[in-house]
């Protein structure tokens, strides 16, 4: 498919609605306007007109908006037709437009892709459009809007600019080795490099917060049957999401709930009680439980406080701990504090946290919520923050590693050429975030995840 084609797509969700919008972008957008409207509307003014088919019969009537390029979202000529939101009407109008030469249905995300290719927005801003649409909380929406408005891109561009100045200084020192002053050892380059590294660390911290807002944390509640796992799921969710009975093994399959803690998405997964099961259905549920455990960001190891005084997970259930991935963080949750009389609260026990609560009464559950938020390093103050994706975090991490390696070359050997190369690679990693340096394959993956009309 050619980027010189004119594209059309429905910009509103499929199905019935009060308003349905078709968006057209490309060189033939003016021809579409003349064919469907009989005229070219005044730029950036709403014009109430009939929408006609090939025979001149009115299909619908509504508002037409004309945005001549380059002053449009895509940078191309753009026509928007806002009619009634009936699927039949919109389909008839769409088919009418597709009868015109060099007009085709847009690929997913192609409008945003053209905006990126025409320098109307960078790659991080383009991704922010999809993130704003998908935002699951007010904080996530605000942060996505900040990214769309260029907050994240500005921070990245400032880092790239600082690296450019540093590279110029380093390469000047390489090109003029006979100068009386040894620029590589006078401390100025190292001081500038330390400043860039500190700024990069600050951006990485903000990006981590943005990633948590976008993707959240996957928490699996695991333990023996009747430990109170489903009761805890209900307490965290604030509703009766899971059936709770005194019968061991009530939960036989994975249950999922999505909640927010101060804006951070939390994906809570309740699992079947872990034990040796003879029942085939329960056995399958237990295997699924282990699959979820192995993919979790954190495991809440649920313990019935009436059955043991132990607080060390290895003492409570050594077989469970032996199978658990060694790098997986766990929090031991001693349940039924309302029965045992244990003091509610949180404590650190060797390498893990221990929380005493009552899932039935809800006492101590707020402490668990705060613990989950803090364990991911999430802060609820997102004023001026931005949303970030995993690829952004990876690019920032790679840039940081290149700067660390570059500093080692500078401090240990005053190796200017090697430092310059590490600075270049760090700059390249950062440029991948905004799309200044990005492969076509990556662009394809990013924009294919967008809505058709975006």
UniProtKB/Swiss-Prot annotation:
Keywords, alphabetical: Cytoplasm, GTP-binding, Hydrolase, Magnesium, Metal-binding, Nucleotide-binding, Potassium, tRNA processing
InterPro entries according to UniProt: G_TrmE, GTP-bd, GTP-bd_TrmE_N, GTPase_MnmE, MnmE_dom2, MnmE_helical, P-loop_NTPase, Small_GTP-bd
Subcellular compartments: Cytoplasm
GO cellular component term of the entry, any: cytosol
Cofactor comment: Binds 1 potassium ion per subunit.
Residue ranges constituting the TrmE-type G domain according to the UniProt record: 216-377
Annotated binding of (6S)-5-formyl-5,6,7,8-tetrahydrofolate, by residue: 23, 80, 120, 454
GO biological process: tRNA methylation; tRNA wobble uridine modification
Primary location class: cytoplasm
This protein's record includes keyword tRNA processing: yes
Gene Ontology MF, one: metal ion binding
Keyword Hydrolase attributed: yes
Annotated residues for binding of GTP: 226-231, 245-251, 270-273, 335-338, 358-360
Transmembrane regions listed in the UniProt entry: none
Entry binding sites for K(+): 226, 245, 247, 250
Annotated positions binding Mg(2+): 230, 251
Cofactor: K(+)
Record-stated family: Belongs to the TRAFAC class TrmE-Era-EngA-EngB-Septin-like GTPase superfamily. TrmE GTPase family.
Subunit-level organization: Homodimer. Heterotetramer of two MnmE and two MnmG subunits.
Task performed by this protein: Exhibits a very high intrinsic GTPase hydrolysis rate. Involved in the addition of a carboxymethylaminomethyl (cmnm) group at the wobble position (U34) of certain tRNAs, forming tRNA-cmnm(5)s(2)U34.
Protein's recorded name: tRNA modification GTPase MnmE
Organism: Pectobacterium atrosepticum (strain SCRI 1043 / ATCC BAA-672)
Protein's gene: mnmE
């Amino acid at each position: 498919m050619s980027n010189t084609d004119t594209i059309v797509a429905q910009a509103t969700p499929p199905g019935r609605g009060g308003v349905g919008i078709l968006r057209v972008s490309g060189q033939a957008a003016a021809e579409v306007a003349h064919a469907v409207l009989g005229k070219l509307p005044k730029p950036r003014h709403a014009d109430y007109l009939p929408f006609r088919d090939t025979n001149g019969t009115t299909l619908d009537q509504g508002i037409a908006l004309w945005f001549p390029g380059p002053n449009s979202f895509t940078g191309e000529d753009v026509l928007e037709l806002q009619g009634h939101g009936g699927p039949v009407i919109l389909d008839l109008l769409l088919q009418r437009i597709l009868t015109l030469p060099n007009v085709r249905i847009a690929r997913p995300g192609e409008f945003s892709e053209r905006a990126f290719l025409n320098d109307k927005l960078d790659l991080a801003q383009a991704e922010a459009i999809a993130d704003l649409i998908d935002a699951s909380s007010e904080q996530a929406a605000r942060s996505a809007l900040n990214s769309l408005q260029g907050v994240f891109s500005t921070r990245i561009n400032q880092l790239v600019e600082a690296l450019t100045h540093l590279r110029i200084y380093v390469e000047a020192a390489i090109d003029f080795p006979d100068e009386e002053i040894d620029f590589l050892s006078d401390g100025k380059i190292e001081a500038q490099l330390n400043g860039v590294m500190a700024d990069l660390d600050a951006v990485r911290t903000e990006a981590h917060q943005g990633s948590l807002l976008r993707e959240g944390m996957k928490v699996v509640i695991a333990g023996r049957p009747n430990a109170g796992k489903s009761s805890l799921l209900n307490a965290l969710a604030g509703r009766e999401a899971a059936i709770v009975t005194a019968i061991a093994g009530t939960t036989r399959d994975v249950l999922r709930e999505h909640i927010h803690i101060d804006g951070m998405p939390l994906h809570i997964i309740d699992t079947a009680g872990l034990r040796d099961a003879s029942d085939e259905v329960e056995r399958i549920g237990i295997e699924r439980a282990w699959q979820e455990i192995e993919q979790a960001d954190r495991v809440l190891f649920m313990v019935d406080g009436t059955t043991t005084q132990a607080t060390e997970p290895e003492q409570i259930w050594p077989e469970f701990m032996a199978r658990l991935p060694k790098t997986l963080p766990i929090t031991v949750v001693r349940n039924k504090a309302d029965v045992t009389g244990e003091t509610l609260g949180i404590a650190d026990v060797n390498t893990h946290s221990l929380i005493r609560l009552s899932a039935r009464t809800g006492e101590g559950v707020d402490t668990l919520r705060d613990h989950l938020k803090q364990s991911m390093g999430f802060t609820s103050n997102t004023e001026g923050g931005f949303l970030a994706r995993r690829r952004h975090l990876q690019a920032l991490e790679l840039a940081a590693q290149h700067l660390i390696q570059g500093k080692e070359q500078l401090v240990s050997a005053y190796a200017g050429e090697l430092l310059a190369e590490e600075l270049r690679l760090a700059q390249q990693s950062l440029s991948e975030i905004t799309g200044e340096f990005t492969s076509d394959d990556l662009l394809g993956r990013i924009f294919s995840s967008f809505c058709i009309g975006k």
